[in-house]
Structures are given as C-alpha cells and as structure tokens.
C-alpha cells in the first residue's frame, strides 16, 4: 500500500450543495436526490461548466434554507457523473468524491450557494505504522461486517484490495454505522494515521455492542424455544386432526374462545365457569350434540356486557330540554328524572331508580321511557310483559332442557351491549300466571335494588349485576302484586286536559301527520277551533291516541283533495270539520240535558282514565225490595246497600214516611249494562239518587259527585281525583262534589281544570243533598209510637278512624 500526500492547492470558486443526514467522503460514488431550488440551480450551473461541486453537510438536517454559519466548513469536492430530472420536480444526481476541501468564504450570490474553497493536503507520516494500522483496520472490518448484516460481504473484498491508505480509511468510515457528527469529524481529519485509528476505535466499540446484541438474541431465542416447540407440536396436531377428518376450524374456534374469555371482563365466578366449560369443550368431539350446547352457553356468557357502561349524561339543562321537547306536561316524571341525574352528578355509586309509570293508554308512558333514555345517554331496550305467563321467560330455562335459552332479561342485556341501559318493562299489570309459574314473582329479584346485583339466570347459572340498569315499568292500573309494587316508585300519569291535548297536537301530532303523509306545511293546516272540536266532539279519552287517528284521517283527506286537483291548500276549521270527519260522535256538555228525578252523575276511575257514570233510580209499588243492575261487582252492590240503609235511617229528615219503604220497590241501574263496575266511590251518588226517587225532588244536571258513604252519612276520601275531574271537565260538568279529605290533592290538579270547575269539598251527606237537589227536602212529623225504640241519633259522629277508599 502507498500513502500519497496531496500538495496544497490554490483556492477556487465552487457551487455548494448542502447535504442532509449524509457525509460524502473522497473516493465515494453516491446517488443524491435534490429537491431544493437553490441546490437544483447549483447543479445546473455545474453541468454547464467543469462539473465540479462542493458537497458540504449542514449542521441541522431539518433546516430547509440554512445560513452559511449552519453548514460545516469542511466538505468534499466532487464530480457530477450523471444528472436526471424526475417527474415530481426533484433531481437525481450521481456524484464521486475527489478530495477534502475547506470553505474560506461564501460569495454573495442569491440564486445558489457558492464559496471560495481550497483542498486540504494530507501530511507525511510513517508508512510502517500506517501499514500496520491498515492491516488491523481490514481485519477488524471483516469482523464488523460479519456481525452487521446491513453491510454486503463484498465490501470486505473491495476494502482488502485497496492500496491507498487514505482511500481505505475513507471507505471504511463511509460504511460504519456511526453518527453524522462522528463521520464529519473523520472527514475533517486530514491525517491518514488518525483516520485509521478513529475507524479502528469506532469499529471496536460497534463490535462490542453487536456482540452483546447477539448474546441477547441468543438468550431470547433459547427462551422462545419452548414456545416454538409447542407451536410446532400444535401445528402437527392440527395436520393430524385434518387427516383424521376433524374440523380445523374447531381448533381455531378454541383459540378464539380462549381469547374472548381473556379479553372479556368477567366476574371471578363467571371466569371460572367459562374456563371449566372451555376445558370440557376441548375434550369433546366437535360434532357431538353436547359440544353444541357448551358452545352456545359460552357464546351467551361472553356476549353479555360485562363492565361495559354507557357514559351517563349529567347535564341537567340538556336532560330537561330533551324531555320538554319530546313530551308536553308530565312534570312529575320529568322532575324525578332530573333529581336522579342531579344526585348521580354528585355520586357515581347511586343505583338506578326503579320507576312505575301508571296511567291510561295513550298518555305517553312508553314514549316517555325512550325520551328518558335519550336524556340520560343510556341504551334503550324494551321488554313487553303483556300475556307473559311463564316464569322461564324472565329467568330462562335450565341447560338440561333441549333448546334451552336465557330469559328475556339476559337476552335484552346482550342486545343492549352495555351494562347500564334503560330497561322498559311494558304492561307489567298484564302478566298472568298458570301451572308454569308466576312471572311476577320472578321479577321480584330483578326489580329489587338490594338483590339485582346478584341476579342469577337459570341458563347461565352465574350471578350477573343488574344494579346499574335503570328500570322503568308501565301499567294502566295498579293491579300488580303488592310485593312487586313495593319495590317500585309509583308515578301516576293522569290524562291530559283539553288545553294540553291542543298543545300536544300543535307541537307533535300535526307535524307528524304532515310528515307521514308527505304534505308541506303550507298545504295543510288545522285551526285551534278545529282542534278543540276534534277533542270535544270526536274523541273522549284520557290520552291522545284516538285524537292522533282523527288528525291522520284529516291529513289523508287533505292529500286526496290536493291530488284530485280540487284545491292547492286545505285548511280545516271548526265550521268545515264535519265535511271531513262526519257527524260528531260525542256531545260536549252536560251528561243529562234536563234536571231529572233519580238520575245523578257519578265519577268513575277506570284503567283508560276517568269516566262519567250515570246512576239511575226508579221507585214502584212493591214490597220493599232493592234491585240493582248494570253488571255491578260486590263492592258496588254493598255500597248501594249502605246508601239505602243510610237513607232509610234518615227518612223523617228527608220527608219520607218510614212505612213507604215497605210498600215500594227501588231499582238502581248503572248504564252501560255490559261494562263491569266496582268500587265504593259511587256511594254518595247512590244515596243522592235514592233520596231523589223517594222525595220526588229532581237532581241538578250540571252536578257530578264522587265519594264513599258510611252508614252515619260521612263522606270518605277516594282515589283517582285528577282523572275524575278531567272526566267531569270533558263532559261539560260545572260543579263537582268531592270528599273534604281529598281537598289536599287539589294542589296536583292543573289550574285550568280548577278554574273551569266549581269544586266543592263535602264531609257529610247532608251537604251533598243540599248541593245536588234543586231544593232541600222538608222534614216531617211522625208518631213516636210507630217508631222503633231507642235508636241512636244518626247525627252522632262516627268514632271510627279514617279509612281510605279507592
């Protein structure tokens, strides 16, 4: 080998090409991709002259337009061998380094970098020492290439053939995996001896690191041998099973089930059960019937939302806005939901409430539950309980039965995919029971906040937590087993007033009718007067279902008229509504047209809301018999007997001769005859009808009444006051007599109802007679000898405590 020294050369001007993340050494042939405008112009300048360019590395690779101070002083003068312009505007250039050079100063050119530079000479050095160093470098380089797989082995052969020590040092330096700063340091070193020593030092350090890396890889490989061995054995087992005809998918299914078990947040009990079932499944033939049962079980168990919760919205203003937008009125329910959200915003451990919405059909119980789910951010699932008679519908069947499945509760939870949905149990009062069990008793565990955290389905046989579920049940009446009702917070939803129905129509029903019938708002309109006419003359209900049907009918007729070309716009008014809906079905006004003897208007509370109840009484010659008709049940029959006994005991005060009762028969009838009726709340109406019949004094047609009567003439409180008052308002009644103890319930009655009715609380039957009859009966004198001896005074107060009648 030889050590050539380069004589010092004079300075010359060269275009400068700043490089990023690369240092080009002399004797290297390197392809470069050039994209910066200045650099491209520098290359164009070079190609037009002697093709010599100065390649210098910039200090910061991220700098797009570096200042001269941000570029290293020492670089390489190179020849441009080839230049190729690419379609994207960049230039590919092939350069060959010639010699080291140092920049003296930059020339003031703006279009590209240009600098005055001079080549750096190499000093004279001891050739023997350099020869020894070069041999060590080549030997070490061979070891380095063997360990570093990124360098081609051919490079070692090339390096060993190089006779120029300077070229050898630069070639080795260019292939080392060292930092740019260290490569630049090698470039700036002119001494061949020092370059070889640095290269040797860098290689020894890299070889040490690579040897440690190799040892680590060997150790990891040994640790992985066991896993790989098991993998190979499993692959062989799969191949054997495939040859034997077993399904390859069966093994994949096992791996999938195992992965699902590990990823699902099962409870400790459920995880143990799942692992046991999977172990059992591994030992079965995939084609066996029992394997299908186990697979189905694991699918159900892993398909449940274990610990997956929806994020509950706690923004009270947003919740109120959603509830008010979807439903008009229903303030009590909305208030309860907002209270729950308020508490939940403070405490995340609060259990979901269990509400029971009780009210007549069509008042929005089911749709309100959907609205609550939207307001709280919960998933909504609905389970219809109407007609459910089998306890297994709730708790599921045991796995011993063929075709067994979990109950509807677990099925719904899987469908919801979240562990905290809003669960609507619809029509809970319509459940039945037979020899298969009582589903209402199975619901006791589901709806008990203290127990439902450990709900156990017969099919799953592991406990599942339902405590985060918000349960809402709906019912038309409280015909629910007491233990079940005790677990729920009952919220009554009475019917709507006429004003509320009109608002509901304007906000919800009319826009829905227009949307569903593809009408435009400017094509179809219904005036407020027409809406009131529909409410009063074509529907009589607590809810708005029939009201909606009538509005849909109006929309259909409007579409028909528009398509026939009769008109471009249909406006329904109170005057032309008969043309669309026909003859009015109901008469809005008093229940009776005239004041009549023995005919009184009572108020009843049914599962479809409040109703007017006409009670008729007639008297005829006979033997003192009392006849009652109208499909009356036991409680109402007893109520009539109590009313008759009260009137008979007060006969003289009412101007009735006592012997008259033995010579006359009284017949009390409650139309309609086909409708079953029960309850004690018509007692005051019965007594009023009997007094009117016996005295011949007519009853005012615009009075309705409700209340239970005692033998002493006291009027006891009743239930369903709001529904009864709404029925009186719908029927055009002007004056309503209610028990005095129900006066406290008037606070829950809408103001427009109280303002439209004259509501009079009464405590004794004498007050009822005074308000109901057109005139008071006059007491008569009666021969004491003909009266029974020592009867207690009927005016004495009843000593018994207050009893509540519904």
Curated annotation (Swiss-Prot):
One of its GO terms (cellular component) is cytoplasm. Coiled coil: none annotated. Residues 594-775 form the Lon proteolytic domain. Homohexamer. Organized in a ring with a central cavity. GO terms for biological process: cellular response to heat; protein quality control for misfolded or incompletely synthesized proteins. Induction: By heat shock. ATP-dependent serine protease that mediates the selective degradation of mutant and abnormal proteins as well as certain short-lived regulatory proteins. Required for cellular homeostasis and for survival from DNA damage and developmental changes induced by stress. Degrades polypeptides processively to yield small peptide fragments that are 5 to 10 amino acids long. Binds to DNA in a double-stranded, site-specific manner. ATP binds at residues 359-366. It is an enzyme of class 3 (hydrolase). The gene is lon. InterPro entries: AAA+_ATPase (IPR003593), ATPase_AAA_core (IPR003959), Lon_bac (IPR027543), Lon_bac/euk-typ (IPR004815), Lon_lid (IPR054594), Lon_proteolytic (IPR008269), Lon_Prtase (IPR027065), Lon_prtase_N (IPR003111). This is Lon protease.
């Amino acid at each position: 080998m030889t050590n050539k020294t380069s004589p010092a050369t004079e300075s010359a001007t060269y275009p400068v090409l700043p490089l990023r993340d690369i240092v080009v050494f002399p004797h290297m042939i390197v392809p470069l991709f050039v994209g910066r405008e200045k650099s491209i112009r520098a290359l164009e300048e070079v190609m037009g002259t002697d093709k010599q360019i100065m390649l210098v590395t910039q200090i910061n690779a991220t700098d797009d337009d570096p200042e001269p101070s941000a570029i290293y002083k020492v670089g390489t003068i190179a020849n441009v061998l080839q230049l190729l312009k690419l379609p994207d505007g960049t230039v590919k250039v092939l350069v060959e380094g010639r010699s080291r050079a140092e920049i003296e100063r930059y020339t003031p050119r703006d279009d590209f970098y240009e600098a005055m530079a001079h080549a750096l000479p190499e000093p004279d050095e001891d050739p023997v020492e350099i020869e020894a160093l070069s041999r060590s470098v080549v030997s070490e380089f061979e070891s380095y290439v063997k360990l570093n797989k990124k360098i081609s082995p051919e490079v070692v052969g090339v390096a060993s053939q190089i006779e120029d020590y300077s070229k050898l040092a630069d070639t080795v330096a260019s292939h080392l995996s060292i930092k740019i700063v260290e490569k630049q340091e090698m470039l700036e070193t002119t001494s061949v001896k020092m370059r070889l020593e640095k290269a040797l030092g860098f290689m020894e350090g890299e070889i040490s690191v690579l040897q440690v890396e190799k040892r680590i890889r060997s150790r990891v490989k040994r640790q992985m041998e066991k896993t790989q061995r098991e993998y190979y054995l499993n692959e062989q087992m799969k191949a054997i099973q495939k040859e034997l005809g077993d399904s390859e998918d069966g093994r994949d299914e096992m791996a999938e089930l195992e992965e699902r078990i590990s990823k699902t947040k099962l409870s400790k009990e459920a995880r143990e059960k799942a692992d046991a079932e999977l172990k059992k499944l591994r030992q079965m033939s995939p084609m066996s019937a029992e394997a299908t049962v186990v697979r189905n079980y694991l699918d159900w168990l892993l398909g449940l939302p274990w610990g997956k919760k929806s994020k509950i919205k706690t923004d009270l203003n947003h919740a109120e806005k959603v509830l008010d937008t979807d439903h008009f009125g229903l303030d009590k329910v909305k208030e309860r939901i907002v209270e729950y959200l308020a508490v939940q915003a403070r405490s995340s451990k609060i259990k979901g409430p269990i509400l029971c919405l009780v009210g007549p059909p069509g008042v929005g119980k089911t749709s309100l539950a959907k609205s609550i789910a939207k307001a709280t951010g919960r998933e909504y699932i609905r389970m219809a309980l109407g007609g459910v008679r089998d306890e297994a519908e709730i708790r599921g069947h045991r796995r011993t039965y063929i075709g067994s499945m979990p109950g509807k509760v677990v099925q719904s939870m899987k469908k919801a995919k979240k562990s905290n949905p809003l669960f609507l149990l619809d029509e809970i009062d319509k459940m039945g029971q037979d020899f298969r069990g009582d589903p209402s008793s199975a619901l006791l565990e589901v709806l008990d906040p203290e127990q439902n955290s450990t709900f156990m389905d017969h099919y799953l046989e592991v406990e599942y937590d339902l405590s985060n579920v918000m349960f809402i049940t709906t019912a038309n009446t409280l015909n629910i087993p007491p233990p079940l009702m005790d677990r729920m917070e009952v919220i009554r939803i009475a019917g709507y007033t006429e004003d509320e129905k009109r608002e509901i129509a304007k906000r919800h029903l009319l826009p829905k009718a227009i949307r569903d019938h593809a009408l435009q708002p400017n094509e179809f309109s219904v005036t407020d007067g027409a809406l009131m006419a529909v409410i009063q003359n074509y529907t009589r209900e607590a809810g708005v279902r029939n009201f909606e049907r009538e509005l849909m009918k109006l929309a259909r007729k409007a579409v028909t008229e528009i398509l026939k070309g009769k008109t471009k716009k249909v406006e329904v008014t109170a005057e032309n509504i008969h043309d669309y809906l026909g003859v009015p079905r109901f008469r809005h006004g008093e229940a009776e047209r005239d004041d009549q003897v023995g005919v009184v208007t009572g108020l009843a509370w049914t599962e479809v809301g409040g109703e007017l109840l006409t009670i008729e009484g007639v008297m005829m010659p006979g033997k003192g018999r009392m006849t009652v008709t109208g499909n009356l049940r036991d409680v109402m029959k007893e109520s009539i007997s109590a009313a008759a006994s009260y009137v008979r005991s007060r006969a003289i005060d009412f101007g009735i001769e006592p012997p008259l009762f033995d010579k006359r028969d009284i017949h009390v009838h409650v139309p309609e005859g086909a409708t079953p009726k029960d309850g004690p709340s018509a007692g005051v109406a019965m007594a009023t009808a009997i007094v009117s019949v016996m005295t011949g004094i007519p009853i005012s047609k615009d009075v309705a009444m409700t209340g239970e009567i005692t033998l002493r003439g006291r009027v006891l409180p009743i239930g369903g006051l709001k529904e009864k008052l709404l029925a009186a308002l719908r029927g055009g009644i002007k004056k309503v007599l209610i028990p005095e103890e129900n006066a406290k319930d008037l606070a829950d009655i809408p103001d427009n109802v109280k303002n439209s009715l004259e509501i009079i609380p009464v405590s004794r039957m004498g007050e009822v007679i005074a308000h109901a009859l057109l005139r008071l009966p006059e007491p008569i004198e009666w021969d004491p000898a003909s009266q029974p001896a020592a009867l207690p005074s009927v005016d004495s107060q009843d000593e018994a405590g207050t009893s509540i009648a519904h």
